[in-house]
């Protein structure tokens, strides 16, 4: 327990920016859910067991349109397909996490993946507890935001337009932090180039998964050149 608390204290400051973003986005999700006729219990269930922001927002629309369960599953898999790339890149760090592994796989969101690649535990701090703490904290923030939003939304109405930009802003900040911490920026510029080209060719609806696949292939094929 002492080791876990030590790792938890080390991890917490790194998650504050995610707390702010997840609080706002979680509240937006909770409010939208209530506006479509669902209550806080649905918000709690979805945030506990689905825990995928984009999928949860899409699910509101699908459920309201009385879509079949099969359609919901297919759309969810397509929307979250990018997580496969994240999981593959985290295999080495997750392999010794023991009983934590199933939860870490469940809790590997975009933001958690970014933090785990940006920060490492201090000397003397257990890495597996550090990884677990970041994952657990971020999940708690999302659940908390969803619950607050659903409870507040059941009593008040809000205009949530534009709130989705919060997470985009956080990603830009995380990218800049990682950019400043490294001296070799070839990977960063390669990622930007591939993303921009895919966005221009395939549009906002399809570019993300294609860009991620191309980035993984590029890193595999040109690893030595990029590390120089």
Where are these regions (language model features)?
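Helix-loop-helix hairpins and the membrane-proximal interhelical loops
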Residues: 1-50, 61-70, 227-228
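Helix-loop-helix junctions within the multi-pass membrane cores of secondary transporters/permeases
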Residues: 2-3, 74-164
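Residue-level signature of the transmembrane alpha-helical core
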Residues: 16, 23, 44, 48-49, ...
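Transmembrane helix boundary and interhelical junction motifs in multipass membrane proteins
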Residues: 24, 28, 41, 52-59, ...
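Residues that define the loop-to-transmembrane-helix transition and helix capping
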Residues: 41, 70, 100, 128-129, ...
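Alpha-helical transmembrane segments and their membrane-interface exit regions
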Residues: 51-55, 78-85, 170-176, 195-197, ...
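Membrane-embedded alpha-helical modules
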Residues: 128-210, 221
């Amino acid at each position: 327990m002492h080791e876990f608390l030590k790792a938890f204290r080390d991890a917490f400051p790194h998650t504050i920016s995610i707390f702010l973003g997840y609080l706002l986005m979680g509240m937006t999700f909770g409010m939208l859910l209530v506006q479509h006729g669902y209550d806080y219990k649905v918000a709690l269930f979805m945030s506990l067991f689905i825990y995928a922001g984009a999928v949860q927002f899409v699910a509101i629309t699908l459920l309201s349109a009385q879509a079949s369960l099969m359609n919901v599953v297919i759309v969810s898999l397509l929307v979250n397909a990018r997580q496969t790339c994240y999981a593959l890149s985290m295999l080495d760090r997750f392999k010794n996490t023991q009983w934590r592994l199933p939860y870490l796989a469940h809790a590997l969101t975009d933001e958690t993946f970014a933090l785990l690649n940006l920060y490492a535990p201090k000397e003397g701090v257990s890495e597996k507890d550090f990884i677990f703490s970041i994952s657990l904290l971020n999940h708690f923030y999302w659940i908390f935001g969803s619950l607050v939003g659903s409870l507040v939304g059941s009593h008040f109405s809000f205009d949530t337009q534009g709130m989705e930009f919060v997470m985009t802003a956080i990603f830009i900040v995380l990218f800049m932090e990682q950019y400043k911490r490294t001296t070799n920026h070839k990977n960063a510029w390669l990622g930007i180039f591939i993303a921009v080209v895919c966005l221009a060719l395939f549009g906002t609806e399809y570019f993300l998964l294609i860009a991620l696949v191309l980035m993984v292939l590029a890193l595999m094929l040109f690893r030595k050149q990029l590390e120089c």
